Amino acid sequence: MPTTEDAGSDFTRRRAAALLSAAARDLADRGASADDLFPRYLTAVPADLAAAVRAAIARPDPMAGWSVSRGLLAGFPDPGPTPESWRKAGAHDTAQLDIAIALIAASLGRVFGWAGQQDGRLVHNIVPSPGDENLQVGSSSLTELAWHCEDSFHPRRAELLLLVCVRDDDELGSRVSSVRRAELSEPEIALLSAPSAVIVPDDSYPDDWAGDDVRTATVWASPDGLCIRYDPAYTRFPEPSAGHRPAAPDSPPELSELSERAESPTPAGARSPVTTAPLLGSS
């Protein structure tokens, strides 16, 4: 699979890391947070910092959908013990790191948050949380997440997602793959292109985010290849007389086969993938 890792030279990454650290420290000292960074403290990322970040971060290859960048955040202080949930995360302890992540994201695109996710914060804390152990959400800890695309339920979901590994004592990785590697046949593409699936928000969203049963296609063509909206744990196939039925085991076999064809583990040491729309992910 074509992938891109660690764009630029060591000097490029060190320069970006130094600029990022200095900017984040200064902004945190002035009382900024990731959520009020724009426009209260900045109208845009400083040009030299944005250019350095873009030079240091590997943009995903369109066929792969992910890339790994290392070292940009290595100089930040330890954020303290892992909290029991995102609600108990200490904003002061992670202020510099959160600001740095927001600056990286804003250097690559327009940053936004979900009102129904972690009180609308731009930078989320994904930590194992009591009560979520067996759910198909990022805060689970005893179950393997099914292959899925992030926030598939929403037509205006992010085109670029940043995952930053802060602590990984058990050396666990993330699995990523692309629908463009699935080698789907023309009949399979035709079936999966029909707007038949209803994808609902996952269990990390409040109940009032359920929305309407809008049917959507699972795959569709774009100028640079197939794209996908896929989250089998939260997919339903409405029937006129029977309401909703689970995506598995009664969903079209082509939908289930997408997971089987997605098997492509992240290389050893790849802990912070930057992912794009065509990607399937699992942790």
Positions of PLM-derived features:
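Active-site environment of non-heme Fe oxygenases that use a 2-His-1-carboxylate facial triad
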Residues: M1-V45, P62-P77, N125-P267, A277-G281
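Short secondary-structure transition/capping motifs
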Residues: Y41-P46, A89-D93, L97
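Long, hydrophobic/aromatic-enriched structural stretches that serve as scaffold segments
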Residues: P62-G90, T94, A102-W114
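Hydrophobic, Leu/Ile/Phe/Ala-enriched alpha-helical segments that form helix-helix packing faces
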Residues: V53-P60, A100-F112, L255-E263
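Catalytic cores of Mg2+-dependent Asp-rich isoprenoid enzymes
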Residues: S272-P273
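Short, charge-rich binding segments
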Residues: A58-P60, D93-Q96, F153-H154
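Charged, low-complexity intrinsically disordered tails and linkers
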Residues: R40-I57
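A gly/proline- and charged-residue-enriched helix-loop-helix capping module
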Residues: A91-G138
